[in-house]
Amino acid sequence: MGGSTSKNSFKNTTNIISHSIFNQMQNCISMLDGTNYIGVFGDGNIINHVFQDLNLSLDTSCVQKHVNEENFITNLSNQITQNLKDQEVALTQWMDAGHHDQKTDIEENIKVNLKTTLIQNCVSALSGMNVLVVKGNGNIVENATQKQSQQIISNCLQGSKQAIDTTTGITNTVNQYSHYTSKNFFEFIADAISAVFKNIMVAAVVIVVIIVGFIAVFYFLHSRHRHEEEEEAEPLITSKILKNAAVSQ
């Protein structure tokens, strides 16, 4: 498999895993403090250094349940294999009987590597929606920040060792089953054509050997028959010579 293709496949596979896990996380997140809300009403208010951070709680047992569900694993495996198929990364896996085995290996890889700790390590600074409302005239709000951590979580997932182990395992699985993809597609076709010609040449050699064999057998039988005829003719010639000699006397 080419280097650029492998990197692209690795990146895409990581993104698929991160997206799938993040979707499951959203189903298992609950707010601890509710939505942060700051309201400024009236005239002439000066607000400095406003920071908003929403603390959320992640139900790890919920995540564990969703991630370990057969449907989640199967769907994630299907997304990954379909993505690889679309890239024509594993060309021959869609033409041989090993396709089922490859999908099984990918699913097992996901089961082994995607643990709850992967989620726990990436939600420590998660923030959700923050609201700052300012009404009135002459109000000044300075140095107001609203923290957004969803991108941080996504980056954490993509950079985690477990996610990397998963994508590495999947990449190795693809390499294992698609042994022809280490070559250029046209080289693969050339190899196939070469194999056909080799088979033709082998068949031609066999035919030549058979023909030579027939010729040898025919020559042997013909020579033997001729020799027998000569042996039968020799007494007749001798007898005729003797008769002619007797008459002349």
From Swiss-Prot:
Q: Which residues cross the membrane?
A: 200-220
Membrane topology term reads: Single-pass type II membrane protein
The reply on keyword Membrane is yes
**Stretches in topological domain Extracellular:** 221-249
Keywords annotated in UniProt: Capsid inner membrane protein, Host membrane, Lipoprotein, Membrane, Myristate, Signal-anchor, Transmembrane, Transmembrane helix, Virion
Lipidation feature positions (N-myristoyl glycine): 2
* One cellular component term from this protein's GO annotations in UniProt: viral inner membrane
Q: Subcellular location, in the record's words?
A: Host membrane; Virion membrane
Q: Which residues lie on this side of the membrane: Cytoplasmic?
A: 2-199
**Which superkingdom?**
Viruses
Tell me, what does this protein do in biology? Essential for viral fusion with host endosomal membrane and core release.
Q: How does it assemble?
A: Interacts with A151R.
Q: Which family does it belong to?
A: Belongs to the asfivirus E248R family.
Mind telling me what this protein is named? Inner membrane protein pE248R
Classification from the root reads: Viruses, Varidnaviria, Bamfordvirae, Nucleocytoviricota, Pokkesviricetes
